[in-house]
């Protein structure tokens, strides 16, 4: 069951991803509506992700300005700490730990704190485009869209909590 629902949800996520790239329809209103509905149902803040993903494509492989999956540099303190830790526990154990951490914590950490982003932007938050988080990723003209994304995800979370209260947490987790 989990494989079937995960595959279906991934398919919906891919359609929303295409909407975020502007590849779903020649009508912007349609692709933003479809993308917003699908991503929001999957607890992804559509417009926030649309913006950060565009920056990711514009700055891929840039060691300071990259938006996601920016490696720690050996010439910086956090990179030296990472290398020392990897050396201490071994390459295989470090790889297993890194993969586990990315799969369990990576997406929420990225959305809430800009984890894996480049150092030039500071900590960002896909739900809160203003202080105390860095606002470079979401210029003022994006704020209304970020707040719309936040509201949508909040509504879906509230519906899930209400469903869990009514039907039980197990029933909601089995969706």
Positions of predicted regions on the chain:
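Non-catalytic, topology-defining segments of multipass membrane proteins
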Residues: 1-8, 40-174
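Post-HEXXH active-site segment of zinc metalloproteases
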Residues: 25-39, 69-73
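Conserved donor-binding loop and adjoining core beta-sheet/short helix segment
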Residues: 1-12, 31, 35
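Short, functional N-terminal and low-complexity linear motifs
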Residues: 2-5, 18-25
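Active-site recognition of the HExxH zinc-binding catalytic motif
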Residues: 13-22, 53-57
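Short, conserved acidic/polar surface loops in the N-terminal third of protein domains
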Residues: 12-15, 25, 45-50
């Amino acid at each position: 069951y989990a494989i079937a629902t995960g595959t279906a949800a991934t398919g919906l996520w891919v359609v929303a991803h295409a909407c975020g790239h502007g590849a779903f329809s020649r009508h912007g209103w349609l692709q933003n509506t479809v993308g917003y509905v699908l991503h929001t149902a999957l607890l992804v803040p559509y417009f926030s992700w649309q913006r950060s993903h565009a920056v990711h494509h514009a700055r891929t492989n840039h060691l300071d300005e990259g938006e996601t999956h920016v490696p720690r540099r050996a010439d910086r303190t956090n990179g030296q700490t990472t290398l020392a830790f990897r050396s201490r526990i071994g390459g295989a154990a470090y790889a297993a730990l890194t993969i586990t951490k990315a799969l369990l914590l990576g997406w929420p950490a990225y959305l809430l704190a800009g984890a894996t982003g480049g150092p030039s932007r500071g900590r960002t938050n896909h739900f809160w485009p203003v202080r105390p988080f860095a606002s470079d990723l979401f210029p003022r003209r994006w704020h209304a869209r970020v707040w719309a994304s936040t509201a949508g995800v909040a509504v879906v979370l509230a519906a899930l909590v209400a469903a869990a209260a009514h039907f039980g947490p197990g029933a909601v987790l089995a969706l």
